Swiss-Prot record:
Its EC number is 3.1.11.6. Heterooligomer composed of large and small subunits. The keyword Acetylation does not apply. It comes from Dechloromonas aromatica (strain RCB). InterPro entries: Exonuc_VII_S, Exonuc_VII_ssu_sf. This is Exodeoxyribonuclease 7 small subunit.
Length: 79
C-alpha cells in the first residue's frame, strides 16, 4: 500500500488509491491489522477527496456568480 502523504495528493490519485483499498478489503484476504490500517488510510483519503470536491464546488459557485478569482473554503465559510 502506498504511503504518499495524503495532503500532497491530487484528487484522482487519492481516489484511485481509495478504490484499491476498497477492493482489497472487499477481497477479504487482509489480516486484521492490515484491514484496520487500510480502513484508517481509506477514511483519510475519503476526507481528502471530499475536501477537494468541496473546494472545486466552491470555485464553481464563484465562477457562476461572475467573480473570476481564486477562493478557498475558509473564505466561503466566512460568508
Amino acid at each position: 500500500m502506498d504511503q504518499t502523504p495524503i495532503a500532497d495528493m491530487k484528487f484522482e490519485t487519492a481516489l484511485a488509491e481509495l478504490e484499491d483499498i476498497v477492493a482489497s478489503m472487499e477481497g477479504g484476504k487482509l489480516e486484521l491489522e492490515a484491514s484496520i490500517a487500510a480502513y484508517k488510510r481509506g477514511m483519510e483519503l475519503m476526507k481528502h477527496c471530499q475536501n477537494q470536491l468541496a473546494d472545486a464546488e466552491a470555485q464553481i459557485r464563484v465562477l457562476e456568480n461572475g467573480q473570476f478569482k481564486d477562493v478557498d473554503r475558509s473564505t466561503l465559510e466566512a460568508q
